[in-house]
């Protein structure tokens, strides 16, 4: 176990390394360092046993594919179906709870894309960029910075359409940018994105509420 002083020192070093502000005014840190995704909440809003406390979590991203055609996660029939959907440039929205493998499934679909496909990935933490190790696609990764309107998800989605990609991958849609995702689909640019949802039936309502 580590104490609060050690935790604060560790997160301070991470924020300095990634050149991200972490303070009372910027109380949430969400960054990637190598294969580690780190999310921290400042002590100004974090509580443990009713006391102010910095809290953080570390998620280790696997550099090796967790979902493959041989992993048993996808049946042969489903694998063939996804290959047809990718070949036909069909847009897809992946829904599920936190930790259910939405990002890993995105990576699985990315690896099925044609090596000549030009792919633009829009991500907060560049976790999807690791698929380069197992893909021959022309991948361009853009990192979202919510502190600047010029690099928000909405702005980057609109700019991506000017780049005429074969695929636009939005790592996660969380709010009004879902409208830009829909508009992109309507213009013929296929998109793959993820959302948090309880089940498939709740996904249309969830997406509608993001837009409204």
Label every model-predicted segment.
Residues 18-21, 92, 167, 192:
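Short secondary-structure junctions and interdomain/linker hinges
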Residues 102:
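Conserved lysine of the Walker
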Residues 94-96:
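Hydrophobic anchor at the beta1->P-loop junction of P-loop NTPases
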Residues 2-89:
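P-loop NTP-binding catalytic core
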Residues 108-212:
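Switch/coupling sub-region of P-loop NTPases
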Residues 89-90, 164:
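Residue-level detector of structured alpha->beta connecting loops
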Residues 99:
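Walker A (P-loop) phosphate-binding loop of P-loop NTPases
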